[in-house]
Amino acid sequence: MHWTGRRMPFRYNESDNLSMIKICLQSVVLLLAVMLSQDVGAQGVYGDVNNDCEVDIADVNEVINVILGYTAPVPPPDEPELDTIPVTVFDTELSPRHYYRIPAIVQLHDGRLLAMADDRHNSDTDIGGNRGIDILGKVSTDGGKTWGEPLMIANGASFSNGFNNSHGDAAAVADRETGRLLVMCASGTQGFLSSTLQNPLRVGRYMSEDDGQTWSENEVTSEMYGIFTECPEVNSLFFSSGRICQSRRIKVGDYYRIYSVVDGPMGVGCLVLYSDDFGLTWQALGGPHARPTITPFGDEAKVEELPDGNVLLSCRSKQTGTSGRLFNIYNYFTASWGEMAISNDPEGGTYSEDCSCNGELLIVPVVRTSDGRNMHLALQSVPRGKGRQLVSIYYKPLLDESDYDEPSDFSMGWQRYQVTDNYSAYSTMIATADGHIAFFHEDCNDNNSTSAYDLLFQQLSIKKITNGRYTAIKQ
């Protein structure tokens, strides 16, 4: 018997109560295949009897899914084309000056969209170089074609010298079951580079039970730095803006686990956190001493749950010349991070020419149009061009576990869809309930500038992004 290049997924995953049953069934099916000396073909049907039994583990898993009563998701018969014309949600003005930055977006329980941004008023600088930064939201009831009036999420008071002076860089998630909203943000007057344990960049937590109409406010600075009490070098941190990832597999108590990343100082890199109570408390994934991107130094990052329940990290580098993303994987079976990989090849990597910038990471279920095969697609948004231009979405197919069981799997194999021709920077995206991609990014648009950004929204189909190679599966 020989293998077809796929590895047995013998991993314990605390999120899957059927994992041991599936492992036993894998063994039984494989043993039967050997005893019968039959070939398990690429389509999962038995071929002619031969003396060399070739076993495709993906097809074994399909048999097991049938035994356990799992049903494969059914794709829409034809994914409709979408109106991809960008819509300005937050409009930066240069005369008089009024700046918006840092996109975040969630889908509410009833299907409406809530977009968020920093209102930086008359300065485009970050917390520490600016005062009175607010986080605003706008709601769309028609899939992003139009947006309502601004609503206040976190109100910065420029006269304050403490926590309430400024709030920005929102990281957001809507709970899948309850609809509760969570925003984690940077707060206060101290900048990231000047933060100390005695006078740190502060951390805010905002929660809403009514679709963002009202918000409860809590300062959680001591709690967040307290995670790293054993690590005094962690003297500055903030949550990476954009999407907080919610697990589809791990549920503890009332909530599915959420993951996010805080950016630590030079020499520390990014630090991945998780919460099992929807942001009330956080822990470091892999422990407080884990450093998944120590060299080159990790910066703002995003995480996404892989189809097997492990956690994929995609990170911006503090070293601009890296020209790409840094990837790593947390493996629940080994309870450890892997060996970081760099994806910076201009042809097959997540290349970003001399540009260090935040972006978004997403993995969605799709159908490959060439053969109707159900699989997953990794999406990574980032500027492609030099000096923050040409925001694009890179995409990479994930057919089975051999495509995502090592960080190096994400170094190559990416293709690209270009979203804009303009100078453009931070971006985020979520998969909506209908399988489309709600994309929200910073774009110089009509501002005749290389760094004054409007925040633009557009709906994109998987079919559009991949030039028809894949179509979405409704989630």
Predicted segment positions?
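Asp-box/BNR beta-propeller blade signature and adjacent active/binding-site loops
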Residues: 78-475
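Short, low-complexity intrinsically disordered segments enriched in A/P/G/S/L with frequent Arg
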Residues: 8-10
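Alpha-helical segments with a strong preference for the paired helices of cellulosomal dockerin domains
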Residues: 43-77
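Bacterial N-terminal signal peptides that target proteins for export
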Residues: 17-28
